[in-house]
Amino acid sequence: MNAPIDITNVILKTDRLTLRPWRESDLHDFYAYASVDGVGQMAGWLPHADLEESRRILTHFIDGKHTFALEYRGKVIGSLGVEEYREALYPELAALQGRSIGYVLSKTYWGQGLMPEAVKAVTQWLFNNAHLDFIFVGHFDWNNQSRRVIEKCGFRYLRSTTYETRYGTVETTMDYVLYHPERSKPHADT
């Protein structure tokens, strides 16, 4: 089942990043990467058309209390959300606590190992502090950058599903799971 998550007072530090709740003052940094063609499409959304669109989504991030801002050298360069997963697809996990993560990173910072660093910090926090039993993540079948992040972070392939994006396309997603390392898995094939 989807576990409750609230990151209101959570700040995670890695060697290069600070992961923290979003602030209204992050608006221009957010728009700077979210308006770039090719960034949002990797996660299923179109580039932001204007600052007001970014403001609306930023307000959603702040109010939702489950999306980290990724700060690098004083600038927000991406986000990592701890989202609800589609429980109906995984009835075998109904007795366990879990969530799904999703992430996006400014094109300027692709290929530098920053996203695996962020994902590892958040998964560790989710297991140790939010007491999750498992975490899902997925990528579109054509998104090799996300696949590499997922593999580097130790997730195991689970299955393929279809997903309707916010811009109306239907994509095949490759779904992965990471179980809490000190808890037993529901059964051997997942």
Language model: regions and residue ranges:
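Acyl-donor (CoA/ACP) binding surface of acyl/acetyltransferases
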Residues: 1-40, 67, 71-190
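Conserved GNAT-fold acetyl-CoA-binding loop/helix
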Residues: 38-58
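Short loop/turn motifs at secondary-structure junctions and domain boundaries
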Residues: 59-64
